[in-house]
């Protein structure tokens, strides 16, 4: 199979998925290395396909409910042990954590899609965080970071802000 054919097949798979596909799973399915998949994804993005890279794998961005939701960027600070508490504060008010962003002194803005949409997503992310040899991005900026949060209404975004403030996470 040529690279072009493989990328076409990967794209078809991503279009039918509602959950992320890991690079390792794609590599196994197409009998190539994970690095080849990373390169394929980069080439597809260069062709204007909106492919998200999450901690659970790759997704193609579909037009969905979150697209029409109001969004707000929150500047927060907390310990690694408080990550799950932060996520739950957002999810309890119907919010979704779309990304994490840090402002690095040397590299500038570093943004990673999270797509934490449920308590199960939050638990899974936190479990991976605790068992990973890697550190969260917030370590680069003394625990300070941003999240883009989407919620069904501005009122819910206000309640999320209030809860993050109450917990001492929101920096203003």
Predicted regions and their residues:
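Residue-level marker of alpha-helix boundaries and capping positions
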Residues: 1, 14, 31, 77-78, ...
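Extreme N-terminal segment that seeds HTH/winged-HTH DNA-binding domains in transcriptional regulators
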Residues: 1-28
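Solvent-exposed alpha-helical segments within well-ordered globular domains of core cellular machineries
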Residues: 8, 12, 39-42, 127, ...
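Generic secondary-structure signature for well-ordered alpha-helical cores
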Residues: 15-19, 35, 46-49, 92, ...
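N-terminal helix-turn-helix
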Residues: 20-53
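Conserved beta-strand edge residues that scaffold enzyme active sites
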Residues: 28, 58, 104-105
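Minor-groove-contacting beta-hairpin "wing" of winged helix-turn-helix DNA-binding domains
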Residues: 51-62
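Mid-protein regulatory/catalytic core that forms ligand/cofactor-binding pockets
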Residues: 68-172
């Amino acid at each position: 199979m040529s690279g072009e054919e493989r990328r076409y097949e990967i794209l078809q798979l991503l279009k039918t998925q509602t959950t992320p596909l890991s690079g390792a799973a794609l590599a196994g399915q197409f009998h190539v290395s994970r690095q080849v998949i990373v390169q394929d994804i980069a080439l597809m993005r260069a062709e204007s396909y909106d492919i998200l890279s999450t901690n659970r794998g790759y997704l193609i961005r579909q037009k969905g409910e979150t697209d029409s939701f109001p969004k707000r960027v929150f500047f927060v600070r907390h310990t690694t042990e408080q990550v799950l508490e932060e996520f739950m504060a957002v999810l309890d008010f119907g919010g979704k954590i779309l990304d994490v962003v840090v402002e690095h002194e040397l590299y500038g803005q570093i943004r990673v899609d999270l797509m934490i949409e449920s308590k199960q997503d939050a638990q899974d992310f936190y479990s991976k965080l605790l068992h990973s040899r890697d550190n969260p991005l917030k370590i680069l900026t003394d625990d300070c970071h941003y999240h883009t949060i989407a919620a069904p209404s501005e009122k819910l975004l206000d309640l999320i802000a209030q809860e993050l403030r109450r917990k001492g996470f929101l920096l203003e």
